[in-house]
């Protein structure tokens, strides 16, 4: 347990570590140490090589779009989460650490790679990026070792809990058992049970809810910004009914519940279009870029202030932490956020060339998994080679192969695939 705890209301259990450690420097909180460990991790650096929505090189030939990566998204999510969390009484370093950690388990090629790895790992427990994040934080990322092996970054209970978006194992979603979303693999259950001690059922802690909303806000706003920069989105299309209906179709069942009336989504979109800061055109000029940046700032402020006000209205002015409250996001605000996500899906991810690229990416991941399985331990990094040699059975060895692939960047996955298969 840390010798220096953050100010109340975080109790000693919240700042405990799975493997107890002495405090190295007085005056530094446990959550500040957690944040620093994540910032200095190789896993965070690797996110720079993982695409967010628009891959480098996909921008307009007229200007340098510098599209976001998973790393820049995580940094922006952390900034949004830190400020919203602080406004609601959370420890800001704790929320920032959770935001920085939330995508660490993301495999190459994003959710597309996640689907391909899940298919490959079906007989060893599947693959889910959030469960992989927990595995990375508590096992794979080298920082602390005990007699029983690696404990990963050995973060505090509260930080691990705040980084856990889906606090249940595969097939145990509290409302939809068939949901593909889960947050822990079977062989990581001991540390999961420890971090969830005294947690009420499948509830996420308040800081995890702040992290989750910060993630939604950051990627909904910035994915649209990147789509505009790259020339994939024409804001004027959102004024025409056929295009609007296509956006609403993309939202229903994906970002809002099935059966949501298109009229509710139309009202949400119209509220955004009516704002005087909404970008009704974009030509890449400096004034246009400034207007677009102002729009992104306005949207982030709009979404965060709505959540802050609604949560304060429900719980008052005290410090809201751990399991003392639920983040309240007005339905109208969630609808506005969902519409932005759907705009990015409709105009960026559903482009014909993107469909072809995603098919190619799935082939790369599937062939790479088979090639590594056939050659292992050859082809594995030294860290994973040792884990493969120590694995108790075929199921455990397959999980090591999955861990290796999940650690790769987009470019290193393609490079290793080409080297092992002979296919470019």
UniProtKB/Swiss-Prot annotation:
Q: Bias category Basic and acidic residues: which stretches? A: 20-31
A Gene Ontology BP annotation from the UniProt entry: dGTP catabolic process
Q: Does the keyword Calcium apply?
A: no
The record's section on InterPro entries has:
dGTPase, dGTPase-like, dNTPase_2, HD/PDEase_dom, HD_domain, PHydrolase_assoc_dom
Keywords, A to Z? Hydrolase
| SUPFAM superfamilies in the record | HD-domain/PDEase-like
Q: Which domain of life is it from?
A: Bacteria
Q: Which PANTHER family match?
A: DEOXYGUANOSINETRIPHOSPHATE TRIPHOSPHOHYDROLASE, DEOXYNUCLEOSIDE TRIPHOSPHATE TRIPHOSPHOHYDROLASE
Which family does the UniProt entry place this protein in?
Belongs to the dGTPase family. Type 2 subfamily.
What name does the UniProt record give this protein?
Answer: Deoxyguanosinetriphosphate triphosphohydrolase-like protein
Q: Which organism is it from?
A: Streptomyces coelicolor (strain ATCC BAA-471 / A3(2) / M145)
């Amino acid at each position: 347990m840390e010798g220096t705890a953050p100010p109340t209301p975080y109790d000693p259990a919240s700042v405990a570590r799975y493997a107890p450690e002495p405090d190295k420097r007085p005056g530094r909180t446990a959550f500040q140490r957690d944040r620093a460990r994540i910032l200095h991790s190789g896993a965070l650096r690797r996110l720079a090589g993982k695409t967010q929505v628009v891959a480098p090189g996909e921008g307009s030939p007229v200007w340098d779009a510098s599209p976001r990566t998973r790393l820049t998204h995580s940094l922006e999510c952390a900034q949004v989460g830190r400020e919203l969390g602080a406004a609601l009484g959370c420890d800001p370093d704790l929320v920032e650490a959770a935001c920085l950690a939330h995508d660490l388990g993301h495999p190459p090629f994003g959710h597309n790679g996640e689907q391909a790895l899940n298919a490959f790992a079906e007989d060893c427990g599947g693959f889910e990026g959030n469960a992989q994040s927990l595995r990375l934080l508590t096992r794979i990322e080298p920082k602390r070792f005990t007699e029983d092996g690696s404990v990963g970054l050995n973060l505090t209970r509260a930080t691990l809990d705040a980084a856990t978006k889906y606090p249940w194992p595969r097939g145990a979603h509290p409302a939809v058992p068939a949901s593909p979303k889960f947050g822990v693999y079977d062989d990581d259950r001991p540390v999961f049970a420890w971090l969830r001690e005294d947690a009420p059922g499948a509830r996420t802690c308040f800081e995890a809810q702040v992290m989750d909303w910060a993630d939604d806000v950051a990627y909904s706003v910035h994915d649209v910004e990147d789509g505009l920069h790259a020339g994939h989105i024409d804001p004027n299309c959102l004024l025409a009914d056929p295009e609007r209906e296509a956006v609403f179709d993309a939202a229903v069942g994906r970002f809002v519940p099935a059966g949501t009336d298109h009229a509710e989504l139309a009202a949400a979109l119209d509220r955004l279009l009516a704002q005087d800061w909404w970008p009704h055109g974009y030509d890449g000029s400096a004034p246009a870029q400034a207007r677009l940046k102002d729009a992104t700032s306005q949207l982030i402020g709009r979404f965060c202030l709505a959540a802050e006000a609604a949560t304060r209205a429900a719980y008052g002015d005290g410090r809201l932490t751990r399991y003392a409250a639920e983040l309240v996001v007005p339905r109208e605000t969630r609808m506005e956020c969902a519409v932005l996500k759907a705009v990015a899906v409709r105009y960026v991810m559903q482009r014909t060339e993107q469909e072809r690229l995603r098919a190619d990416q799935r082939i790369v991941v599937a062939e790479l998994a088979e090639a590594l399985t056939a050659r292992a331990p050859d082809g594995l990094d030294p860290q994973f080679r040792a884990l493969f040699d120590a694995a108790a059975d075929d199921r455990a060895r397959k999980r090591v192969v999955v861990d290796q692939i999940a650690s790769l960047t987009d470019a290193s996955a393609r490079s290793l695939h080409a080297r092992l298969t002979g296919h470019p």
